[in-house]
Structure formats: C-alpha cells, structure tokens
Amino acid sequence: MAGPVLLFKEGTSRSSGRDALRNNILAAVTLAEMLKSSLGPRGLDKMLIDSFGDVTITNDGATIVKEMEIQHPAAKLLVEAAKAQDAEVGDGTTSAVVLAGLLLDKAEELLEQNVHPTIIIDGYKKALTKALEIIDQLSLKIDVNDLSSPTAKAQLKKIVSTTMSSKFIAGGAEEIDKIIDLVIDAITIVAEKRPDGTYNVPLDLIKIDKKKGGSIEDSILVHGLVLDKEVVHAGMPRRVEKAKIAVLDAALEVEKPEISAKISITSPEQIKSFLDEEARYLKEMVDKLASIGANVVICQKGIDDVAQHFLAKKGILAVRRVKRSDIEKLEKALGARIISSIKDATPEDLGYAELVEERRIGNDKMVFIEGAKNPRAVNILLRGSNDMALDEAERSLNDALHSLRNVLMKPMIVAGGGAVESELALRLREYARSVGGKEQLAIEKFAEALEEIPMILAETAGMEPIQALMDLRARHAKGLVNSGIDAVNGKIADDMMKINVIEPVRVKSQVLKSAVEAATAILKIDDLVAASALKTEKGKKEGGEGAGAETPGAPSLE
C-alpha cells in the first residue's frame, strides 16, 4: 500500500470546491457591503487612515479601494474591477464594485440550489449581452455638434450635475456651479471634433493644481499653465510678454563628476582661478540661451546662484526644479522641444507664450504661463479652505471631466437614479422566460441584483427601500421607463430625465461589463492554495500577497 503523497510544502493550506468558492464570494461581498452606503447623491463618506496617519475623507469608490490595503485575493479582483472602471471611463467605480458583490451574493443562492458555477456564468453573460442591447434602446442621443452653443452647454451641465451631486464634499450650490462651469469650459477648449461627429478629448491637456486658501468659488481656469514655483532671483523680471521659453531638463550648474576626485590647492590664486572657471562655464551656458533668443527659462533641475545672477543681468525670467510631468505638459503646450544639452540648443527648440508672469496666490507665489502656442492647453487652479476639501474637489473635478469625455466620445445618455436598472430588471425577467434550462435562473438573479441598486439609493436617501422598489416596479410595469429614485428630494420621480438626473451610456455600460467580469472571474475559481508564510529570524511572517492566508474560513480584508 502506497504511503501519503506530500504535494505541497509544509504549512501550505488548501481549500477546494464549494468551500473555496464560498470563501471567495464572502470576501468580495464583504467589500461590496462596505461600499454600498457610499452610493448615490446621498451616499455617506468613508474616513480612511493610512499607515502614516494621513486621513482621507471621501465617498469616491476608486479612492476608497485604493486607500484600503486589501489582502484577500478575491477581494482584490473587485479592486481590479474598480481600477478598470476608473481607467476606462473615470466614473461608476462604486456602482461596479457594489453590483459585482450583488451578483456574487445572488450566485451563492443558486449554488445552494446546486446550480453549477458554469451555468451561472453563462446565464450572467447572456444577461449582460441582453442588458447592453436594452441600454442602447433606452438611450437618448444628444446634440453636441457645436459645444459653444447654449443648448449643448445646458445638456453638458445636466450630465456634470448628476456626477457632481454624489461627489462634492462642500455641497454648496455655488461651489458646485463653479466647478461645473470650469469643467465645461476646459472640456470645450481641449475637445477635438472627429468626422463622425464625436470628439477626441485628451484630458492630459488639462492640468489641475490645488492651492490652499480662499474658497472653491475662487478657483480659476487659466488658458495656459500654472507652475507652483516662484522666480528664482530677485533681480529677474516678474512679467515677460511675448515669451520665448527654453524648457530644460539639464542643470544650469556645475555638476560634480561621477568619478571620485580631489583637487589640491596650494595658493589663494588657484582658488580664484577655480571659481573664475566655474563662473565662465556658467556664463557660457547663459550666453548660449540668450543667443538663441530665450527670455524665459524653465528648468527641471537646479540653477546655480552664479547662473541666476547672469540670467538676471540678461533680463531672463527663470524657474527651477519643475516637476517632470509639468515639463512634459509645457513641451506640448508651448510647442517647445525639451533641451537636454544647452550647448546644442537652437531657436527652434524654444516654445512660445503671450505672457509669463509671477503672481501671488494666497500666501504663495506661482508662475502663470498664458496664451500658449497650443491654445488647447488649460490649467484649472483649485482653491479651498483645507487640504481635505481640496483633495475631494480634485476627485470631483476628475470624475466630472471623465463624465463629459464619455458623453462626447459617445453622445448617448440614459436616465439615472436607478431608472435604467429597474427597467433592465423588468425586461430581463421577460427575456429569462425565453431562455431554457437553469440559465434562466441565473438571468433572473441578475435582474434581482440590478433591482438592489435603486433600493440602495432609496436607503441612502432615507426612504423605505422595499416600498420604493414596489413603487418602481409598478411604474415601470405601466411603461414609465425613466422612473427612478429622486434621492435629493427623497421621493420617486416619474421621469428622471425631466429632473436632469442623467448618465452617459458609456459609463452605465462599462459598470455592467466590469461587474460581470469580476463576478465571473471569482465564480470560476474552485481551488485556493495558500503558501506558508516565510519566517524571519525573529519569527515574524513575511511573504507575498498570499502569505499567511487562512483558508477556509471567514476572509480577512486587512
């Protein structure tokens, strides 16, 4: 008789079959439950404290899952779904994670009835395909032919308002209106129209800076770029018109040699000669920049005090230690070429701007570059009373920018407030009857999961969720396809379009895709093998993501 077979290293744990699947489902559902209360315009905020003690207060799904240090591999799949949603459309992250959790919760009910995971996956995929078809039928095309027209701007404002209603920490109408106006103006400038009537919206041309002080209403849109730096020398001009700008990633200083070297000096004359040579070298670099016509120098690296003196004598405005990301944006905006070798610089390397000026913003000085060669480069300067308000305003701004980009890339909208989910649930139940076999059960569970979205919206708005769901079902059965939860006023509206609660089709479709992909990925797993943790000399555990995982049992998200 053969002895026991040792397949894994000592300490390795394994769970398989339904145990592994239930463990994974529980982890994912636990994460989704945490995010449920943050969904919608009345969603609550989460306070996240990282290992350094830094505090983040937000209800933005992408930020929440990024800040939480989640360990369980199944829950990490939902985090990846949120990241995919954020990368693709920049909005709907909370919805994607919550819906994935709901789909898995419903799948577990089917597993209890001995429905095989493969059948559930096939049913969910069929439901997704049908749901995307229905969304296209429910969608309304909007006219974005002329973005400067009042009609188009009014439509865009409605879309941004829906996105902002659930995001903005300050919550004041004036602040929200200010941000909405900034977003629409910025998008209108950078958008490029395609032959088919849609737009390419390069968001990398929109730079966002934050400066503490004042209020959100003091935020401004700059037609150019803003550098959070000040002019390096008191003798330099503070304002340069018709600026010819040299963008450097080379240092304007004498760099130390990479080899180890010592200089032996035996007399004061040698010291003077040494310093004179350094000054001559720096003067040559400044003279070279002046000779190609530069009257503004923006440098990624340092500028020596002696070089600053020579630049000031030439009347050149200079800024140093500018971030690499800003240098790259300047290259695009100014039509410049980044200069790596000053001695090889030519006039063709220079960028152009109508005005470069140092201004005081709050307690700090900033350099404004306006009238750039590329007129589509813009900078939004956010103001706010504290860092947390500024951070949340920036997240709100990014979501709003992505929301507008989505609708310009695909100018189709649907009703918000859970109206689409309610109508999808109704039609998917009808569709399920036409599908044979146990897949019908999975499609019905998909419909149930979708219906929980308006229930969550109702609950966060302080409404009775079950009563709200019953009312919604009745209205949709009567043909009110746009009926949904008016969370702001705490009631059910017959037409969410009329009260300007609308969402881009691109976001809504991607939410469904991301949620189904994450849920099906978890349902496919039937074996969980966790390697034993490595131990240090002191007996502390070490290892990768799977180190120290405990299975089976209740999952830990920490």
Curated annotation (Swiss-Prot):
Keywords: ATP-binding, Chaperone, Nucleotide-binding. Signal peptide: none annotated. InterPro entries: Chaperone_TCP-1, Chaperonin_TCP-1_CS, Cpn60/GroEL/TCP-1, GroEL-like_apical_dom_sf, GROEL-like_equatorial_sf, TCP-1-like_intermed_sf, TCP-1_chaperonin, thermosome_alpha. The keyword rRNA processing does not apply. Residues 548-558 have a biased composition (Low complexity). Pfam families: Cpn60_TCP1 (PF00118). One of its GO terms (molecular function) is unfolded protein binding. It comes from the Archaea. PROSITE patterns: TCP1_1, TCP1_2, TCP1_3. Residues 536-558 are annotated as: Disordered. The keyword ATP-binding applies. Forms a Heterooligomeric complex of two stacked eight-membered rings. Molecular chaperone; binds unfolded polypeptides in vitro, and has a weak ATPase activity. Belongs to the TCP-1 chaperonin family. This is Thermosome subunit alpha.
